[in-house]
A protein has these predicted regions:
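Conserved, mostly hydrophobic/aromatic
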Residues: 7, 39, 63-66, 94, ...
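An N-terminally biased module of ancient metal coordination in phosphate/nucleic-acid-related enzymes
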Residues: 1-58
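Hydrophobic faces of well-ordered beta-strands that scaffold small-molecule active sites
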Residues: 4-8, 46-51, 75-78, 101-105, ...
Length: 158
């Protein structure tokens, strides 16, 4: 039986080359190679690699780099920015990225990150996801109602 981990994050150490947005209470690094070694150790065949928003925000370049190094092990998901008026183009470009299998919306209820569930940027994302046949992964800690409202408005979104 093939075993796929439905969500992993891998990341490089915080360096000027690829600086972190925040410094969480995580290990200093869990690189793509280290993730593959850990997966091998426990018998995981593949994983959905979600670019770590807390570290890299909307820059999924590290996820792309890791997927290219391990194309048979990782599929990738990119957080997208509801405030970007060109988010539809971002999603179209992402769809053409080898290994891309979805996009992510951050809908947590945290200071400075609250988002109104009727935000037009969320609607742009949902419409583009349907158009480009990309599933939407939502993080909605403490804000499940916002996620439900978005789903209700866009029932064709996966």
């Amino acid at each position: 039986m093939t075993i796929i981990d439905s969500q992993v994050h891998a990341y490089e150490a915080n360096t000027p080359k690829r600086p972190w947005h925040n410094v969480p209470n995580w290990p200093d690094h869990v690189t793509g190679d280290e993730m593959v070694a850990a997966m091998d150790k426990v018998g995981v065949d593949g994983a959905i690699f979600i670019s770590a928003f807390g570290l890299y925000r909307y820059d999924a370049s590290y996820a792309v780099q890791v997927q290219r190094a391990h194309p048979d092990r990782f599929a990738i998901v990119k957080p997208v920015d509801p405030d970007d008026s060109a988010v539809g183009d971002v999603i179209a470009d992402w769809k053409r990225t080898p290994g891309a299998v979805g996009i992510r919306i951050m809908l947590t209820k945290e200071p400075g990150r609250d988002r109104d569930p009727t935000d037009p940027g969320l609607d742009r994302i949902a419409r583009a996801a349907v158009k480009h046949d990309l599933p939407v992964n939502m993080l909605c800690w403490g804000n499940l109602d916002a996620g439900t409202a978005l789903i209700d408005r866009h029932p064709d979104t996966h």
